[in-house]
Amino acid sequence: MSSHDQRASGMNFVERHGLWSSDQFKAAESVEQEIQAQKLELVRFSFADQHGVLRGKTVVASEATKLMRSGVAMTSTLLAKDTSHRTVFPVFTPGGGFGMPEMEGASDFLMIADPTTFRILPWAPNTGWLLCDIYFPNGKPVPFATRQLYRNILASLSDRGFDFVAGLEVEFHLFKLENARLAPSDCTWPGEPPEVSFIHQGFQLLTEARSDQIDPFLEPFWRTIVALGLPFRSMEVELGPSQCEFTFRPMSGLQAADAMILFRSAMKQIARRHGLHCTFMCRPGLPNIFSSGWHLHQSLLDLKTKANAFVSDGAGQVLSDLGRFYLAGLLANARAAAAFTTPTLNGYKRYRPYALAPDRVIWGQDNRGVMVRVMGRAGEPTTHLENRVGEPAANPYLYMASQIISGMDGVARPRSGCVGRHALRG
């Protein structure tokens, strides 16, 4: 059936191009019912750009059902932005700077909702939210869409018999917003940074008194995160002034990256509505500040046995052979992967010796001074690797994809002497 015939038959964009699974079609029906049952008025359609920033449009609820299947048009310049939100490719030249006719002339692409991601936003009255994948009008996936790239990596990993399991440990700064800097003279490109003050003085790591001091600030955040259905685990007062940490239970595959995208965006929006400013910038330019990191806890699930593939057989080894080879791959590819684990210049300010942040490519068993911290013992089902290299501003899809590619390269090409069996005894 030609595209013209498909249009004539009344098929929508999703149906014409076979974009949804049966589970997604079922989820779409549930979304429609939920919109009506909850009397939602607005639905936000969002996608994660190259930097892991959510962009999108808000539509009235009565249009959401149709647009889930037909798509929401967006300008392709959104795929050509730097971190200051400037378009940095010549989009009005042949190929649009990408060598692709689809990117010429600031033309449109389409956001297609993933109905399984639907949430009702607790902080925005009568508003739903959908995370989207992005396609060109001809039905082809945007080849550099980071969520799709990560999904492809996960599919390749699945073909090898594994799924990726990740736990999020994310540091951030939460400030009082003293001056949002909205005067006309402040509205430069990029805009002037806000004036802020701290919510705690720092240097009292994990004290209960300091935790209680900031509890009134953190309560609306953790309550909202729980209401969103994210697997929230703990909140902690960190070492630096106005620095905090949230952790999440392990998640598999796409769920972990999607959770980080939603968490980060939610925190910023909730903060602004409460007169606060939340930033995942690694090292804000303020006196006495401490750098924030994003530690990515990771392991592989054996799809046949449903067991943790990093667990040793109990013969005195902390990691299985596969786990050792995966670790060796993380180490061998760490420099290349840094483009995705630490994508900003600011992130490199964190790499200092004796600063609880890695400044060299090394591993250790339960050692917070190394890049990759091996957690667990022989036969321990929760055995995993904690890569401490990342910054909180990293694109989750690219960060996690880089870990899988790096680790599985180590599995495919075992490196003798990189991580020897004798060095990993439990």
Give short role names for the model-derived ranges.
Residues 249, 253-284:
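Gly/Pro-rich turn-and-neighbor structural signature
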Residues 2-234, 256-259, 426:
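ATP/Mg2+-dependent ligation/transfer catalytic cores
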Residues 208-212, 234, 251-258, 282-289, ...:
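Alpha-helix capping and helix-loop boundary segments enriched in small/acidic/polar residues
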Residues 2-18, 27-30, 262, 269-270, ...:
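Catalytic-core signal marking the mid-to-C-terminal active-site face
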